[in-house]
Amino acid sequence: MPEDYKIISDTVQDGVRHITAVPSALVCSRQIDFDLVDGTIRNLRYTGGCHGNLQALGALLEGQPVSFALERLSGINCKARGTSCSDQLTRVLRAVL
């Protein structure tokens, strides 16, 4: 099954890897931006979607290892769509590892 997200930018500057992705059209968010620093998630931001919930997700994942997000967020389903904004993040994380 082909992936339904698209990584539009993956750059490294001063040891910080910055990733920008467009999630599946099935979810409400339109873009995911985050940094990876030494295997941890930093500066997670979503454009669009449920603003409060996605801000909370960013705050909860700040400084957490990628494995933390993968273990807890993979497969979360929103409104029977087969994916969610948090699940889309885990799909992108797997792709860039």
Pin down the residues of each PLM region.
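Structured beta-strand/loop patches that form or line metal/cofactor-binding pockets in enzymes
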Residues: P2-V37
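Active-site- and interface-proximal helix/loop "cap" or "latch" segments in soluble metabolic
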Residues: P23-Q31, D35-L97
